[in-house]
Structures are given as structure tokens and as C-alpha cells.
Amino acid sequence: MNFLAHLHLAHLADSSLSGNLLADFVRGNPATHYPPDVVEGIYMHRRIDVITDNLPEVREAREWFRHETRRVAPITLDVMWDHFLSRHWTQISPDFPLQAFVGYAHAQVATILPDSPPRFVNLNDYLWSEKWLERYRDMDFIQNVLNGMANRRPRLDALRDSWYDLDAHYDALEERFWHFYPRMMAQAARKAL
């Protein structure tokens, strides 16, 4: 899962959206640096990552990547799940339009920015102003996201080529998304993530 899915599942679970978004920027035990609700959001994010990576649908999808891109398949798939969530948002969350949800999420996350790591603050400067969460529905934007990550981290250069794996297996990936994401939503609503 990437930004949008973590925020959405956190909302469904009444967990800290701030902590769920911040989690990738925090190493070790967050309890000494953040309030309890943010800490619980960080831990929820970590649990979601482990659960998602071990889902049979996700493990199967990783196998569809070519040898030269399989190493970056988990990252590519996380971005792709956000694509499907953004694309199908009106079906998934008919009572909370995406633009309104993004505004709500932004307001929640903004409260922790003064005490956040600089890299997280930098991400937030772009995430909201450039409307990444809404633009995830556009596959051209997904390609730009993958290229951007490859540019920032040369060891992830294979992300550029992973676009072709997504394109080749688009329909099957979308089908897998519909298999597992509603289950994860139900787990979040039961606070079982």
C-alpha cells in the first residue's frame, strides 16, 4: 500500500492518519518522539505493510514481474494499489468524495508537520499541493511517480522499467486488487489491522 491506501485504511479504523502517513519516515521505536495516537498509527502502517506483502494475491502479482524488475515489484505494486483505489474511489467510498477525503487527510497530517522529520515535511509540500492522491488514477502519473523514485534513488533504477510489467498485467492486477482490498477495508473497520 502507498499513501492513499494507508490513509484510507487508517480512516476506516479510526487510527491516526498522521501516524499512518509518517510511518515510512520513522525508524525503531516511535514512542519516545510522538504522542500515543501517532505511535499507534505508525504501528498500524507497519502491520498493514506486513499483511499486504504476505497476501496470496500480492505474492502472485510479484511473480508476474520480469527478472530484471522483480526486485522492485513490492514498491511498484504499492503504487499500483493506490492507482486502483484512486480510480475506483467513488465505488469504494461513495459517501466521502476523494477530494473531500484528501482535504480531511491533509488537515489531520498538517498538525504534526512542525515536529516531523525534514524529509516528511518535504514530501508533504508536494503530496498535497500537486494533488498526488487524486492524480494516482492516471497511469501517466504512475509512470512519473516510478521514474521520480528511480531518479532520487539510483539503486531503484529498475522502477523505470517496472512500468511495462504493470501495463502488461493491468487487468489481472486490477482483479487482484478487488480480491484483497475490500477484505482489508473490512478488517480496518473491525479494527483488526
Swiss-Prot record:
GO molecular function: [acyl-carrier-protein] phosphodiesterase activity
Key words, A-Z: Fatty acid biosynthesis, Fatty acid metabolism, Hydrolase, Lipid biosynthesis, Lipid metabolism
Record-annotated disulphide pairs: none
One GO BP: fatty acid biosynthetic process
EC number: 3.1.4.14
One Pfam family hit: ACP_PD
Annotated catalysed reactions: holo-[ACP] + H2O = apo-[ACP] + (R)-4'-phosphopantetheine + H(+)
Role, per record: Converts holo-ACP to apo-ACP by hydrolytic cleavage of the phosphopantetheine prosthetic group from ACP.
Matching NCBIfam families: PRK10045.1
Record-linked PANTHER family: ACYL CARRIER PROTEIN PHOSPHODIESTERASE
Protein name, UniProt field: Acyl carrier protein phosphodiesterase
Organism: Salmonella newport (strain SL254)
